[in-house]
């Protein structure tokens, strides 16, 4: 598993439904070279993939009944292919792991402004070259991507179970790669545990930055990665200027530092002081308090990303906007939730986007979210994974 903020709750649930100390947890990546930044559990060992410490921490793979892979990215493809034949391997789906490498999925993932930023950023770090040399490098890069995709194809072919709550993503994967994997329902905490937080942030400075009387608030995205298409989202939100008194809260506590810096600069030029970059890491209680008090959630990703943001927004009775191509939009629609597509509501004059949901719709959305992502269902799903 990588070092991430929601894995402690997963570990707590797994330990509660399985035999005590029956599992071994290895974090193969952290932003900090020698410590875990987000995971607090003492059961987790930090050992970078490929290091001696990693293979010592894992030990003989044959001793395990099953192996859970959190975020199946390139290094984990290699690890999967090194495991004994017949090993039960569980892929705990994140979204970004399927759409890797980004170069292969670039046309789908990134809209025009974001794609241009990435191209310009790449050009800035490359030295001027003669056209024939540039062509050779492009061919080498294309060959490298082809080899990576072959590795990915083989690794996905070894997966026994895909653990995820959205069948639409499962169908995308099985249509793109040959695999006999079965779908097991699964979602990460804190998708289900909104009730356990007090939700009242004591950070008065943060409240003052984010909320003011008579000012509507938009929560944009969930992180500082280009897959959020924030640069294109700014253009979508621009027509609101002069029509509404609003503020855009943008979670940027983790992501690509260069992209975050560029985004803040660009947003300042378009939205001025309406843009509030949240570059600090926010504890769960504070973060969900922001979601509770914002007016609308604006998700401009083309893929599954920020599911907990969307689910929390729906639980709190907020309007949540997606692109129609996003499988989260389709998932929520299919389950009877009232969500809105950006293409319809933010076209032309972009009117009535802040209109509050009727009380009965808020109540229905909250009820359905609790049915889909309840504490009991989370434990049931993880127990099924442990026993399967």
Description of each model-found segment:
Residues 5-9, 225-239:
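A conserved mid-protein helix/loop that constitutes part of the nucleotide-sugar donor-binding site
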Residues 134-185, 381:
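A short, active-site helix/loop in glycosyltransferases that binds the activated sugar's phosphate group
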Residues 66-68, 83-133:
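Active-site proximal beta-strand in glycosyltransferases
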Residues 57-76, 88-92:
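Short N-terminal targeting/anchoring amphipathic segment
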Residues 368-388:
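C-terminal alpha-helical cap of glycosyltransferases
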Residues 205-228, 248-250, 369-371, 383:
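Conserved donor-binding/catalytic core segment of Leloir-type glycosyltransferases
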Residues 261-281:
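Nucleotide-activated donor-binding/catalytic signature segment of Leloir-type glycosyltransferases, i.e.
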């Amino acid at each position: 598993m990588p070092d991430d903020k929601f894995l402690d709750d997963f570990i707590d649930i797994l330990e509660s439904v399985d035999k005590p100390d029956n599992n071994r947890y290895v974090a193969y990546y952290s932003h900090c070279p020698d410590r875990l930044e987000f995971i607090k559990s003492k059961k987790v060992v930090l050992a970078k993939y490929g290091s001696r410490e990693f293979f010592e921490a894992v030990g003989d793979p044959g001793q395990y009944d099953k192996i859970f892979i959190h975020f199946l990215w390139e290094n984990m493809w290699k690890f999967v292919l090194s495991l004994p034949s017949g090993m039960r391997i569980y892929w705990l789906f994140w979204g970004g792991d399927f759409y890797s490498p980004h170069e292969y999925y670039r046309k789908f993932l990134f809209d025009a402004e974001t794609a241009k930023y990435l191209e310009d950023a790449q050009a800035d770090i490359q030295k001027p070259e003669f056209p024939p040399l540039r062509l050779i490098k492009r061919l080498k890069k294309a060959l490298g991507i082809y080899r990576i995709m072959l590795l990915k194809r083989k690794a996905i072919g070894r997966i026994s179970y895909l653990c995820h709550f959205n069948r639409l993503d499962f169908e995308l994967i099985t249509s793109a790669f040959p695999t006999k994997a079965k779908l097991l329902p699964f979602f990460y905490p804190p998708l289900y545990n909104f009730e356990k937080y007090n939700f009242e942030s004591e950070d008065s400075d943060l409240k003052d930055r984010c909320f003011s009387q008579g000012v509507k608030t938009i929560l944009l995205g969930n992180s500082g990665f280009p897959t959020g298409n924030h640069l294109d989202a700014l253009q979508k939100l621009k027509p609101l200027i002069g029509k509404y008194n609003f503020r855009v809260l943008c979670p940027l506590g983790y992501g690509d530092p260069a992209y975050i810096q560029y985004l803040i600069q660009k947003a300042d030029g378009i939205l001025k002081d309406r843009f509030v970059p949240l570059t600090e890491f926010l504890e769960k209680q504070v973060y969900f308090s922001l979601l509770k008090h914002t007016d609308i959630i604006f998700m401009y990703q083309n893929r599954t990303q920020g599911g907990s943001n969307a689910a929390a927004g729906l639980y709190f009775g907020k309007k949540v906007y997606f692109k129609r191509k996003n499988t989260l939009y389709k998932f929520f629609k299919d389950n009877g939730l009232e969500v809105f597509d950006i293409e319809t509501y933010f076209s032309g004059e972009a009117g009535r986007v802040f209109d509050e949901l009727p009380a009965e719709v808020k109540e229905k959305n909250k009820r359905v979210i609790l049915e889909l992502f309840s504490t009991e269902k989370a434990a049931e799903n993880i127990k099924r994974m442990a026993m399967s």
